[in-house]
Regions:
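Short acidic, gly/pro-rich beta-turn/loop elements at beta-sheet edges
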Residues: 21-23, 133-135, 164-166
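A general secondary-structure signal for short beta-strands and their flanking turns/coil
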Residues: 6, 44, 116-120, 133, ...
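Intrinsically disordered, low-complexity boundary segments flanking structured domains
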Residues: 35-36, 107-113, 163, 178
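Solvent-exposed N-terminal domain segments of exported/luminal and surface proteins
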Residues: 1-98
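Acidic (Asp/Glu-rich), glycine- and aromatic
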Residues: 137-182
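Beta-strand elements of well-folded, non-transmembrane domains
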Residues: 15-17, 53-55, 127-131, 140-144, ...
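Extended, loop-rich substrate-binding clefts of extracytoplasmic carbohydrate-active enzymes
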Residues: 86-145
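Beta-strand secondary-structure signal
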Residues: 10-12, 122-124, 153-155
Length: 182
């Protein structure tokens, strides 16, 4: 948690079909002695998570391949090994004159590790907001050929709590890298 990710999420690990909560502890992290993270309360919580893999270097650095951090945002790397598009679970009332856009949050995650590298990692997420609630199931396949990007299949069940003027499902967003004008 911090400047950009202000809400904690509940994390669960699924093993053999059984879920157990994975509690936050500062002992899970290695931090330099002068890190401001040492000043955080012991029950701070998780802001989200990233799935990583060893990148083959001797120093055991890792390569992110999927991230779920902040509101209902998620993203995965492409064939170049870099993040490109990001997505949100839903967008509510974007660009509706006189109405504030709503940003529902993923509040809980259940991560079911793949038993075989060719099988997907399954992530379930609960979505919660003032006007909507729901559940998502993500099938995340990294692929055995690391030159490929991540394949993501998504199932969702959404339930409206009140009328919504404009609802978008998994809208994509990205940053401009370079091109004819820059």
């Amino acid at each position: 948690l911090g400047q950009f990710f202000g809400k904690a999420v509940a994390m669960h690990v699924v093993v053999n079909g059984q879920a157990r909560e994975f509690k936050y502890s500062p002992d899970l992290f290695e931090m330099p002695a002068d890190s401001p993270a040492h000043d955080l309360p012991a029950d701070t919580g998780f802001a989200g998570f990233r799935l990583q893999e060893w990148n083959g270097a001797d120093d055991w650095r890792t390569q992110d391949w999927v991230a779920f951090l902040g509101a209902s945002y998620f993203r995965a790397i492409g064939a170049s090994g870099q993040y490109g598009l990001s997505a949100r679970g839903v967008v509510i009332n974007a660009a509706v004159p006189g109405v504030n856009e709503e940003f529902p949050d993923f509040t809980e995650f259940y991560i079911d590790e793949a038993q075989d590298p060719a099988q997907p990692v399954v992530v379930c997420a609960f979505l919660n907001g003032p006007s909507i609630t729901g559940a998502f199931r993500f099938y995340l396949t990294r692929g055995l050929d690391r030159r490929q990007g991540v394949e993501m299949d998504v199932e969702a069940a959404l339930f409206l709590r009140e009328d919504i003027q404009r609802l978008g499902l998994m809208p994509l967003t990205s940053m401009f890298w370079y091109g004819e004008y820059g």
